[in-house]
Amino acid sequence: MAFKLNIGLLALSLSLSLVHLDGVRAGMATRYWDCCLASASWEGKAPVYAPVDACKADGVTLIDSKKDPSGQSGCNGGNKFMCSCMQPFDDETDPTLAFGFGAFTTGQESDTDCACFYAEFEHDAQGKAMKRNKLIFQVTNVGGDVQSQNFDFQIPGGGLGAFPKGCPAQWGVEASLWGDQYGGVKSATECSKLPKPLQEGCKWRFSEWGDNPVLKGSPKRVKCPKSLIDRSGCQRKDDNTISPYSGKVDSANTAAPAQYKRDRSVCLAGGKKGKSAAGGVDGSGDASGGADASGAGGAAEGSQGQPEGYGQPSGGNDQGSSNGDATTGAGSGSGSDSGSTANGSGSGAPTSGSDGSAVAPPSGGSNPGAAQGGQGGAQPGPSGGHKKCHKKH
C-alpha cells in the first residue's frame, strides 16, 4: 500500500511540474517601475549606435554617458535615473496595440539590449479581456530573477521591486506611496500620489492594460519603430536585418531606418507632440518632488516575498550599502558592476562583437561591496538580473 501511495504521489508531482513548465513557456508580463538606470544605458553592453538614455533626477535632462562614464545609478546612490519618457503609449491607428519598454530574459544581453519584440496576450491574470492586447516593446533591461520567457514591463506605479530606494531618491516621494513593493498601486486613484510626470502612465495600466497578462506564444523580434527609439535613444546595429511589424500603425510607429536620427521632442512634449502628457517637462504639481535626491522614505525594503512569475535571481548579489537590505523579499538581481571597479569580479573590458563594436563582458561574479542597480544599476560587467516587479493582486 505504501509503495502504491508513493508511486501515486510521484505521478502527481510530475504532473504538477509539467503544468508549471507549461505556464513558464506560455509566459506572462509582470511589471515594475524602480527609477533605476537601465542596464542598456551602459556603454559596451551591446552593438548599438548609442546606449539607452540616462536622465538626471528631473527625469528629462539627459546625462551624456561618454562624458560621465563613472556615474552610478540612482538606485546605488548615484545621479543617473530612468527617463520619465519611457512609459507605455498607444498606437492611434490600431486600438489594440501599445508600445513600451522593459526587461526580457531570453538570450544574452548583448543580443537583446535595445532589440524590439512583438507580443500578443490572451487575457490578464484574472482572466479579464484587455483593451490593448498587442504590444511592441524594446528591451532595456536584463531580468535575472524573471522566469524564462516572461517579460517585465515598465509601468509607473507597477512596483519598486527589488530596488525600492531608487524612486524615493529621484522624486522625494516615500516608498509607501508607490504601492506594494511587488505590484505597485492597486487603483488609478492611487496614481495621483505619484510624481506628476508619471501619473498618466500609471493610470494607463487600469484603462488599457491589465494585471500580469498571459502571453499568447513567445514574443517575436521585430524591427524597432521610430517611436521607441525616439524615447530611448537606442538602436541596434543589426536592426536593419530584422523584418518590421506587419500590422497597420500610425506614421510615428513605423519601423526606423538604419542609423535613425531620433526625435527627442517627443519626450520634451510629454511623450506626445503638442500635448503635456506622461514623462514630459510638465513636472509641476502635486507630488512631483522635483529633483530631490534625498532618498526619503526607503520603507518596505524586503517586506514582501518573491512574487509569481519570477525564478531564482542570477548575477550579482545586491549587498551594497545602498540596497543591501532592500532585496531580502525579492532576491538579488543585477550583477551589473564592471570587473574594472574595485569590487567587481568579472572582466572589465568589453569584448568585440562581430561588427567590431563592443559587447557585454562575460557573465558571472558578484559585487558584495557596491550595491548593484536593478535595471543595470552599475557598470557593464557580469550580466544578470535587473530588478523585478510585482505580484498579482
Curated annotation (Swiss-Prot):
<dbReference type="InterPro" id="IPR052288">
    <property type="entry name" value="GH45_Enzymes"/>
</dbReference>
<keyword id="KW-0732">Signal</keyword>
<feature type="active site" description="Proton donor">
    <location>
        <position position="152"/>
    </location>
</feature>
<feature type="signal peptide">
    <location>
        <begin position="1"/>
        <end position="26"/>
    </location>
</feature>
<protein>
    <recommendedName>
        <fullName>Endoglucanase 1</fullName>
        <ecNumber>3.2.1.4</ecNumber>
    </recommendedName>
</protein>
<dbReference type="GO" id="GO:0005576">
    <property type="term" value="C:extracellular region"/>
</dbReference>
<feature type="glycosylation site" description="N-linked (GlcNAc...) asparagine">
    <location>
        <position position="343"/>
    </location>
</feature>
<dbReference type="GO" id="GO:0030245">
    <property type="term" value="P:cellulose catabolic process"/>
</dbReference>
<feature type="compositionally biased region" description="Low complexity">
    <location>
        <begin position="319"/>
        <end position="329"/>
    </location>
</feature>
<dbReference type="GO" id="GO:0008810">
    <property type="term" value="F:cellulase activity"/>
</dbReference>
<feature type="active site" description="Nucleophile">
    <location>
        <position position="34"/>
    </location>
</feature>
<keyword id="KW-0624">Polysaccharide degradation</keyword>
<keyword id="KW-0119">Carbohydrate metabolism</keyword>
<keyword id="KW-0136">Cellulose degradation</keyword>
<feature type="region of interest" description="Disordered">
    <location>
        <begin position="233"/>
        <end position="393"/>
    </location>
</feature>
<keyword id="KW-0964">Secreted</keyword>
<feature type="compositionally biased region" description="Gly residues">
    <location>
        <begin position="371"/>
        <end position="384"/>
    </location>
</feature>
<dbReference type="InterPro" id="IPR000334">
    <property type="entry name" value="Glyco_hydro_45"/>
</dbReference>
<keyword id="KW-0326">Glycosidase</keyword>
<dbReference type="InterPro" id="IPR036908">
    <property type="entry name" value="RlpA-like_sf"/>
</dbReference>
<comment type="similarity">
    <text>Belongs to the glycosyl hydrolase 45 (cellulase K) family.</text>
</comment>
<keyword id="KW-0325">Glycoprotein</keyword>
<keyword id="KW-0378">Hydrolase</keyword>
<feature type="compositionally biased region" description="Low complexity">
    <location>
        <begin position="337"/>
        <end position="370"/>
    </location>
</feature>
<dbReference type="Pfam" id="PF02015">
    <property type="entry name" value="Glyco_hydro_45"/>
</dbReference>
